[in-house]
Amino acid sequence: MKLKPIEVAEILQKEIANINCLSELEEVGQVISVGDGIAKIYGLANVKSGEVVEFKSGVKGLVLNLENDSVGAVIMGDDNQVQQGDNVKRTKEVLEVPIGKALLGRVVDALGNPIDGKGDIASKEYRHIEMKAPGIIERTSVSEPVQTGIKAIDSLIPIGRGQRELIIGDRQTGKTAIAVDTIINQKQAHSLTNESDKIYCIYVAIGQKRSSVAQIVKKLEDAGAMDYTIVVSATASEAAALQFIAPYSACSMGEYFRDNGMHALIIYDDLSKHAVAYRQISLLLRRPPGREAYPGDVFYLHSRLLERAAKMSEEKGSGSLTALPIIETQAGDVSAYIPTNVISITDGQIFLESELFYKGVRPAVNVGISVSRVGSAAQIKAMKQVAGSVKLELAQFRELESFSQFGSDLDPATKAQIDHGKRLVEILKQAQYHPFPVEEQIVSIYVGTKKYLNDVPLQKVKEFEDKMLTEIRLNKKDILESIKNEQRITEETEQKLKAFLENFVKEFVK
């Protein structure tokens, strides 16, 4: 059988069309120099800022500097695996992390890879780590509370869903303890079936010791709080690039809950080390330094991160993302560059003082200079009823206390006010990892403000509170239930509470 030339050509064309090895064009560059986690690359003319590039060894890099004849990229991993002369190819992608409920209960690195030895994460959804913050129209004002379980905070510096409240203080003053207590306190809401009460938590460890992160994870597991928590870890031993991107990755994980009508709480521990990591990257990329050697855009570094926390409008599903950034100060200096930046970005701050901490006032919250600019709108009515006067009374007490150091003879009214102030300070003290339900906090603060503690010796206030709460849980549960359900203290409940407390104080003082 003879084939005509035209038929042969047709057969060849069909066969060629069926071959599955179409060539792909890849844009490739070369590493000119590498060191300190930074690679300088020549030849990637069309690469974009923020794009991911892949080195010969499989390690990924993030392009941050675009220069005339080269590109500066930070290496997200071990820079020993990158050699001078290695080929680098464009991926034409920006950084993405896995998101969704599959991450709950897991410990992941800054890129969303599991590091807890519990296998792969079955997440099908991915999200860019840098997302635009919601606009003004998409938001609504803060109106629902985030209960931290800490009396001093829930009564005096309340936090609302969608708020950004800074926790600031020197090292070893209990900043992380407040954050961990807040996570543990959400367990009660997660035991209920109502989805709108639940707050999912994300804890981001930036530049911390591995032992500290392991300790926190262990504490959360023991408290049964890991079921609704994601831990993102970029420890001190990891590349500065990973410490720099960790908060953005975690924020994207939190935005999944916010944008799907759920509620999330994210803790950045801490943004001082985040700024230091970014300063290191910027200086190595030879960007011009500014104040304290930080680059000029260090304000934008944190503002674009914290602006992503929001309470969404009804049209957008009414979800929320609440942020608790932590800043470590040096010798109580809140006027340094990074602390002032973050104070101006956030909606209030909880200031912890080492002096109070060493005096035994724990949590060591300085009530005088701590504020919550939007949280009071979210505070429940019952708490407003009992805690309205506490801040003023404590301020007056601090003033009188410092004044009384100079004079020994005080008139009875001043002495009574100082004694009352001391008991208020005592009732606001709280053990670590023991958050209180809000209805029990209300009863405790009611006892303090209504002067039921005046006859109780100062050193026995803690014992009084413990016994009183145990008694009320066992025999007067209806009082707690009423406060919890009504969210205010009704006249009937107040009468019951007064009668109970009068009897209890008599019995206790005997």
From Swiss-Prot:
Its main location: membrane. It is found in: Cell inner membrane. GO terms for molecular function: ADP binding; ATP binding; proton-transporting ATP synthase activity, rotational mechanism. Keywords: ATP synthesis, ATP-binding, Cell inner membrane, Cell membrane, CF(1), Hydrogen ion transport, Ion transport, Membrane, Nucleotide-binding, Translocase, Transport. The record marks S370 as: Required for activity. InterPro entries: ATP_synth_asu-like_sf (IPR023366), ATP_synth_asu_C (IPR000793), ATP_synth_asu_C_sf (IPR038376), ATP_synth_F1_a_nt-bd_dom (IPR033732), ATP_synth_F1_asu (IPR005294), ATPase_a/bsu_AS (IPR020003), ATPase_F1/V1/A1_a/bsu_N (IPR004100), ATPase_F1/V1/A1_a/bsu_N_sf (IPR036121). It catalyses: ATP + H2O + 4 H(+)(in) = ADP + phosphate + 5 H(+)(out). PROSITE patterns: ATPASE_ALPHA_BETA. Its EC number is 7.1.2.2. CDD domains: ATP-synt_F1_alpha_C (cd18113), ATP-synt_F1_alpha_N (cd18116), F1-ATPase_alpha_CD (cd01132). It is a peripheral membrane protein. Gene3D superfamilies: 2.40.30.20, ATP synthase alpha/beta chain, C-terminal domain, P-loop containing nucleotide triphosphate hydrolases. GO terms for cellular component: plasma membrane; proton-transporting ATP synthase complex. F-type ATPases have 2 components, CF(1) - the catalytic core - and CF(0) - the membrane proton channel. CF(1) has five subunits: alpha(3), beta(3), gamma(1), delta(1), epsilon(1). CF(0) has three main subunits: a(1), b(2) and c(9-12). The alpha and beta chains form an alternating ring which encloses part of the gamma chain. CF(1) is attached to CF(0) by a central stalk formed by the gamma and epsilon chains, while a peripheral stalk is formed by the delta and b chains. Belongs to the ATPase alpha/beta chains family. Produces ATP from ADP in the presence of a proton gradient across the membrane. The alpha chain is a regulatory subunit. NCBIfam families: atpA, PRK13343.1. This is ATP synthase subunit alpha. It comes from Rickettsia felis (strain ATCC VR-1525 / URRWXCal2). The lineage of its organism: Bacteria, Pseudomonadati, Pseudomonadota, Alphaproteobacteria, Rickettsiales. The gene is atpA.
